[in-house]
């Protein structure tokens, strides 16, 4: 299993959790972004910088992700694409996207987009708090443990 991170939108606190997990579990974590960012020196952590543009980083993640890999993203269409390839998708709040729930989540996202386009103020998600960080860390640990038991 490799971990791919949609890094442009991933909160720093979540990246920090991923960096610690990479070292602890000796698992490859690759951040994909359209701008340079700091990463800790590690043989398990790397940054792939892609050109700017709509969905360029997403397309690179879809291209590289393989069945059994884990993709960290809040981008629901990206999650849907990698799930179709057999990868797992986890959002920064600890919610695991699966083939069983991704279609309904994608439908809700599309509905909210339609509402916003018609002028309805829907607001955005709250900042990531301690409970979301804990949920993410717990779900990540479960997935890594499951992978290592194979």
From Swiss-Prot:
It holds the Pfam family DUF188. It comes from the Bacteria. InterPro entries: UPF0178. Belongs to the UPF0178 family. This is UPF0178 protein Shew_2726.
């Amino acid at each position: 299993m490799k971990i791919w991170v949609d890094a442009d939108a991933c909160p720093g606190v979540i990246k920090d959790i991923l960096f610690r997990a990479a070292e602890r579990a000796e698992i490859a974590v690759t951040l994909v972004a359209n701008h340079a960012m700091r990463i800790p020196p590690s043989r398990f952590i790397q940054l792939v910088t892609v050109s700017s543009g709509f969905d360029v980083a997403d397309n690179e993640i879809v291209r590289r992700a393989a069945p059994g890999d884990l993709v960290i993203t809040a981008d629901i269409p990206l999650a849907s694409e990698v799930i179709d390839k057999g990868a797992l998708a986890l959002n920064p709040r600890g919610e695991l996207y699966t083939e069983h729930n991704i279609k309904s989540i994608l439908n809700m996202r599309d509905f909210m987009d339609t509402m916003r386009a018609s002028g309805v103020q829907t607001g955005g998600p709250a900042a990531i708090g301690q409970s979301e960080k804990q949920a993410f860390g717990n779900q990540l640990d479960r997935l890594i443990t499951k992978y290592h038991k194979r």
